[in-house]
């Protein structure tokens, strides 16, 4: 957003998803090329564009994690903030949003299931998620 001087929603509407995904990939390459020790949370579509998941997995000292939530929990979380998310801004009901989420999770599951660590987060606090990830990394 900073570099483009537009919000993600504006980029999607003005330049399209393909432009956004290409820009996102360029920025991802820059971030992963740095020596910084970071935790990077990507959007759900990031690993599904082109060979981005392969690129992430092939980057030295990178561990991929899939924090899995149920369709119902994702629907609850996303419904009230949907206007800030270009792919779901047009969806008017929780039922339609749930259908959209189911479809996208199915389509994206090939990429998500390539993650080295998979963790169901529905009944976990943020602290518990961090603890579980640290346990899995240590093993």
What do these predicted ranges mean?
Residues 4, 24, 32, 60, ...:
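Short, flexible helix/strand-to-coil boundary loops that buttress conserved ligand/catalytic motifs
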Residues 1-55, 84:
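ATP-dependent small-molecule kinase phosphotransfer cores
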Residues 63, 92-93, 106-139:
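NTP-dependent small-molecule kinase module
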Residues 27-30, 51, 100, 107, ...:
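Short acidic active-site motifs
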Residues 43-47, 70-72, 124:
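Short glycine-rich anion-binding loops that position phosphate/pyrophosphate groups of nucleotides
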